[in-house]
């Protein structure tokens, strides 16, 4: 995956080579370039603030690196929203495959991540650093989908605002030694100082994960005709999907054939209430994979969640649940799509010789 694009080049350009001598090896694991050991947080011995800033700088570099992989390895297109916004205006964006909106002969897969500091293309920043790209990034999922002839849209629900001071300080981190820039950040009362939070500039149409998702649904996804749509949602993404279902019920119910939820944070009682139609729809179109000591796919329902089938993700680690359940999820999609196609075909009018004659004589 990483042969085409080295993460070390990003670090070299940032002038943080002394503090971050890391790259992804042939197994896509994040390792020290000299010792081949896993990432060590405590680089500055027992200096929490400096180690935290180093970790945040690493997270920012990983964010940009994953964006590059989405475009250059997965061949996805970066789409800014809203399209009419001036280039100087803070804008959000998402990624999609080349013919995601126009290819009527393939299903469309939409990825909706958990809430956190990470951005499009990541299930978990922590999983990327400690378990590698195969487990923490969305790239294996995207590649699997493309190989199965899905089109793909990768949402970016956590890209909600710009912090002017932080933007300048990131540039400082990316052009200066981290020790000297850390001092400037503390003196300046920056983002990293709890006493002086920065003023945030919200990104239009993407103030929240819910708004980001609804906007892309309204202005992009809903415009597709004849597309069978599936969602993979993780954590808070499950709550965001249920919000979309409530807001755009008829469109979502007619277009979406399957939803794979992973350790979802949705709340059916609060979000769907006692709506009989919505409850019936999720029962037949949703399945959830949850962290569990049970083997993958074994039933794992709880007394709190019984609204649709729940199975084990095959792991007890939250950050590994998406990668652990991926093969099972695609099997579920294949079966659900086949069932949807069969139902649609069975509802088509059967043209007989007698019906043709009646039509001609009418």
Swiss-Prot record:
GO terms for biological process: regulatory ncRNA-mediated heterochromatin formation. Pfam families: Arb2. The chain crosses the membrane at residues 229-245. It is a single-pass membrane protein. One of its GO terms (cellular component) is membrane. It is found in: Membrane. The keyword Transmembrane applies. InterPro entries: Arb2, Arb2_dom. Keywords: Membrane, Transmembrane, Transmembrane helix. Its main location: membrane. It comes from the Eukaryota. Belongs to the ARB2 family. This is Putative protein ARB2BP. It comes from Homo sapiens.
């Amino acid at each position: 995956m990483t042969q085409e694009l080295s993460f070390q080049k990003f670090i070299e350009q940032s002038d943080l080579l002394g503090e971050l001598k890391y790259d992804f090896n042939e197994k896509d694991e994040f390792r020290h370039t000299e010792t081949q050991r896993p990432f060590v947080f405590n680089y500055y011995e027992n200096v929490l603030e400096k180690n935290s800033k180093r970790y945040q700088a690493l997270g920012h570099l990983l964010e940009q690196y994953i964006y590059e992989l989405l475009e250059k390895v997965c061949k996805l297109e970066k789409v800014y929203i809203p399209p009419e916004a001036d280039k100087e205006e803070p804008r959000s964006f998402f990624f999609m495959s080349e013919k995601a909106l126009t290819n009527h002969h393939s299903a469309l897969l939409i990825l909706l991540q958990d809430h956190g500091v990470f951005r499009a293309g990541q299930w978990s920043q922590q999983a990327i650093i400690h378990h590698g790209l195969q487990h923490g990034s969305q790239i294996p999922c995207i590649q699997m989908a493309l190989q199965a002839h899905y089109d793909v849209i990768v949402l970016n629900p956590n890209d909600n605002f710009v912090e002017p001071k932080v933007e300048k300080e990131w540039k400082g981190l990316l052009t200066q030694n981290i020790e000297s820039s850390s001092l400037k950040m503390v003196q300046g009362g920056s983002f990293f100082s709890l006493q002086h939070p920065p003023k945030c500039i919200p990104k239009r149409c993407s103030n929240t994960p819910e708004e980001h998702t609804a906007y892309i649904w309204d202005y992009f996804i809903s415009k597709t005709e004849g597309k069978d749509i599936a969602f993979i949602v993780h954590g808070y993404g499950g709550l965001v999907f249920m919000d979309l279902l409530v807001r755009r019920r008829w469109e979502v119910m007619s277009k979406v054939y399957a939803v794979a939820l992973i350790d979802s944070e949705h709340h059916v009682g609060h979000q769907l209430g006692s709506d009989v139609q919505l409850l019936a729809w999720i029962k037949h179109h949703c399945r959830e994979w949850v962290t569990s000591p049970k083997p993958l796919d074994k039933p794992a329902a709880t007394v709190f969640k019984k609204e649709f089938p729940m199975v084990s993700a095959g792991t007890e680690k939250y950050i590994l649940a998406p990668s652990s359940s991926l093969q099972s999820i695609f099997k579920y999609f294949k079966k659900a799509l086949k069932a949807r196609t069969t139902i649609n075909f069975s509802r088509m009018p059967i043209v007989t010789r007698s019906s043709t004659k009646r039509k001609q004589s009418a």
